[in-house]
Design a protein with these regions (language model features):
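Non-ligating segments of multi-cofactor redox enzymes
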Residues: 1-220, 224-241
Length: 241
């Protein structure tokens, strides 16, 4: 039931993507920065970072519109991915984008205000035919990468939001703030590998949980490992550092 609910939430988020696209747009953040204002997308990215202090990357599994595409892409290509090379690419993209945002604010003389509806004055991102080009291009990039690379391939390779949440998660852990995590009773584990096979992020859950909890920023708290563990060795819980 939990996984069905999660997939329904992701589907709803995906269907709403024509409305919400600009709030996830890295371009809108740069456009706002060049005008000296924090746009809705930049404010959302910061909010995701703050939320990750307490909830890690749960957003990715339960609410991200592109997460919906990734979930359904597994039906075509469920191959585990090599996380480290893709992480280098993802953080490189994030670094370049962050540099443009910083440069934009610098050229504008700093942050002069906030504009949550920048480029979205009608409250709908895709509000005229020409904007469908951007919309379908974004969808195409995520679909192609997901199908070509494997499990959540686009998330691993190009997602510009996940670094914000990774920073929030690491900050929360470093500060010892109680965080939602996948916790375990290692004594119940029989090393059957079910959790590894089910993990959409290609994490080696069977080894990560042996210290009592999964403590990595790539865990998106989807609960696949929890719901498919035959020995009920895994569950959701709150842990500090």
């Amino acid at each position: 039931m939990r996984q069905k609910t999660r997939r329904i939430l992701l589907l709803v988020s995906l269907l709403l993507f024509p409305v919400t696209l600009n709030f996830f747009s890295p371009y809108v953040s740069i456009d706002g920065a060049m005008a000296g204002v924090a746009s809705g997308s930049l404010l959302l990215f910061v909010a995701l970072a703050v939320g990750a202090v307490f909830f890690g990357r749960a957003w990715c599994a339960w609410a991200c519109p592109m997460g919906g595409l990734a979930e359904y892409g597994r039906a075509v290509n469920d191959r585990p991915v090599k996380r480290k090379p893709l992480a280098v690419l993802r953080y490189s993209i994030f670094g370049v984008w962050g540099a443009f945002v910083a440069l934009g604010f610098l050229m504008a003389g700093g942050v002069k205000g906030f504009d949550p509806l920048r480029l979205t004055e009608n409250l709908v991102s895709v509000d005229e035919p020409v904007k469908y080009i951007t919309y379908y291009l974004v969808l195409a990039v995520f679909v192609v990468l997901t199908l070509a690379v494997g499990r959540r391939g686009a998330c691993h390779a190009i997602c510009w939001m996940s670094p914000f949440m990774a920073v929030g998660y690491v900050a929360g852990r470093w500060l010892g703030i109680p965080q939602l995590r996948i916790v375990s009773e290692p004594g119940k584990c029989t090393d059957c590998g079910s959790c590894d096979r089910r993990c959409p992020m290609s994490l080696p859950v069977s080894s990560l949980h042996k210290r009592g909890a999964v403590r990595v920023s790539d865990c998106i708290l989807c609960g696949e490992c929890v719901d498919h563990c035959p020995k009920k060795a895994l569950r959701y819980g709150v842990r500090g550092r």
